[in-house]
Curated annotation (Swiss-Prot):
This protein binds specifically to 23S rRNA; its binding is stimulated by other ribosomal proteins, e.g. L4, L17, and L20. It is important during the early stages of 50S assembly. It makes multiple contacts with different domains of the 23S rRNA in the assembled 50S subunit and ribosome. The globular domain of the protein is located near the polypeptide exit tunnel on the outside of the subunit, while an extended beta-hairpin is found that lines the wall of the exit tunnel in the center of the 70S ribosome. Keywords: Ribonucleoprotein, Ribosomal protein, RNA-binding, rRNA-binding. GO terms for molecular function: rRNA binding; structural constituent of ribosome. Belongs to the universal ribosomal protein uL22 family. The keyword Acetylation does not apply. This is Large ribosomal subunit protein uL22. Coiled coil: none annotated. The gene is rplV. It comes from the Bacteria.
Length: 110
């Protein structure tokens, strides 16, 4: 039985989130948590929190055994982009894009 957890509108670009997500896709959850714990990237803390939530959902809602869980799927999709203006020289302005993403983690038993 696959169980999911979703974090929406995380203040992180999807491109940077996918770098970390690719490292833990398909791994057992205990090994994935170890990798995320030692990664220095901002995305690793967010993905770790969502993964822990998915594990708790699987244990509570489905009665799954934690030792048998694997990261079945992990998706980092683009969320809404906030557009801001940065003042530049000679009275000009340039756009600043504050990107966000949606992180979805799916765990299942072997």
């Amino acid at each position: 039985m696959a169980t999911t957890a979703i974090l929406k509108n995380a203040r992180l670009s999807a491109q940077k989130g996918r770098l970390v997500a690719d490292q833990v896709r398909g791994l057992p959850v205990d090994k994935a948590l170890d990798i995320l714990g030692f990664s220095p990237k901002k995305a690793s803390a967010l993905i770790r929190k969502v993964l822990e939530s998915a594990i708790a959902n699987a244990e509570h809602n489905d009665g799954a055994d934690i030792d048998e869980l694997r990261v079945a799927a992990i998706m980092v999709n683009e969320g809404p982009t906030i557009k801001r203006i940065r003042a530049r020289a000679r009275g000009r302005a340039s756009r600043v894009f504050k990107r966000s993403c949606h992180i979805k983690v799916m765990v299942s038993e072997d």
